Every structure is written in C-alpha cells, then in structure tokens.
C-alpha cells in the first residue's frame, strides 16, 4: 500500500471540501481551488477527514494513489495558509521592481524583463534584490518562481543570477593563466 496514499487527510475547521464525481473543490480563508482528479480513485469523507481509496492493487492505481492524496493535501494547505517562494537577485546592478501587479527585472540584459502576474499570484519586492512569489496554488507558485529563475539562472563562475533563497550554487574555478 502507498505510504502517502493511505494517510488520512485532516480537514481544518475553516476549510470545506466538496467531492462531486472526480472533481474536488476546496474552499478556505484564502480562496477556492478546484481540480479534476483521476476517475479511478474514490473518496470517503467524514466531517473533518478525507480518505483516498484505490480500487485495486494494480501498478497504475498504486502510482496515482499517493499523488492524488498529496494534491488534495496541497490544495487544503494552500487555501488555509498559502504558498510562498522567495528568490534572490545576485549581481552588480541586478534589481527588481513592481509596476502595478507585474514584476520588472533588470538583470544585465539590454532591456528590462517583464513578468506578468497570473490570477491568484502576487509578487513582492524587498530591498530591490529579493522577490517573493505568493499564492494559494503550490503548482502555480512553483511554476512562476521557476520562470523567474530561468530569466537569468545562477552561473557557476561568479555566482551571478537569480536563485531561490537558500539555494546552493556550486562554484567552479576559472581558467588558470600561463
């Protein structure tokens, strides 16, 4: 049995979960998320718990079981507390600024890079070198943070670029002269 899939999901008191067929809707203080799950899984819901049940022990069902449970748990945590990723800009003259809801990055190109905020995503800029991406969908926050990082990934020689907070960048030694 899947170790993740067999865990029962606790539903906090200020969050409501509704299951209609294979669509799960989660409402909480921060907002609402809805997702269509695998149709083979079934759900047992009590007042404060939700259990994901797989129909058989086939390999296909086992692979989806834990994933489905983790996705539902992430939705519950997102509408209750939200998700946040922080990125750091390292380099001379690298800076970020807000323009309305959008993010403008000056990271060594001849032009500023503009990143638009999707629905449910907010950007925050602190000290011009720290960018915070926040939202209720873990997938969406991670994808946008990854897009921001891919504008100028950290390079191994000087360490310049955009990196996640706390990310270790492996440094290389430069060429040795004659």
Swiss-Prot record:
<dbReference type="InterPro" id="IPR020040">
    <property type="entry name" value="Ribosomal_uL6_a/b-dom"/>
</dbReference>
<keyword id="KW-0687">Ribonucleoprotein</keyword>
<dbReference type="GO" id="GO:0019843">
    <property type="term" value="F:rRNA binding"/>
</dbReference>
<dbReference type="InterPro" id="IPR002358">
    <property type="entry name" value="Ribosomal_uL6_CS"/>
</dbReference>
<dbReference type="GO" id="GO:0003735">
    <property type="term" value="F:structural constituent of ribosome"/>
</dbReference>
<dbReference type="InterPro" id="IPR019906">
    <property type="entry name" value="Ribosomal_uL6_bac-type"/>
</dbReference>
<dbReference type="InterPro" id="IPR036789">
    <property type="entry name" value="Ribosomal_uL6-like_a/b-dom_sf"/>
</dbReference>
<keyword id="KW-0689">Ribosomal protein</keyword>
<protein>
    <recommendedName>
        <fullName>Large ribosomal subunit protein uL6</fullName>
    </recommendedName>
</protein>
<comment type="function">
    <text>This protein binds to the 23S rRNA, and is important in its secondary structure. It is located near the subunit interface in the base of the L7/L12 stalk, and near the tRNA binding site of the peptidyltransferase center.</text>
</comment>
<comment type="similarity">
    <text>Belongs to the universal ribosomal protein uL6 family.</text>
</comment>
<dbReference type="InterPro" id="IPR000702">
    <property type="entry name" value="Ribosomal_uL6-like"/>
</dbReference>
<dbReference type="Pfam" id="PF00347">
    <property type="entry name" value="Ribosomal_L6"/>
</dbReference>
<keyword id="KW-0699">rRNA-binding</keyword>
<dbReference type="GO" id="GO:0002181">
    <property type="term" value="P:cytoplasmic translation"/>
</dbReference>
<dbReference type="GO" id="GO:0022625">
    <property type="term" value="C:cytosolic large ribosomal subunit"/>
</dbReference>
<keyword id="KW-0694">RNA-binding</keyword>
<comment type="subunit">
    <text>Part of the 50S ribosomal subunit.</text>
</comment>
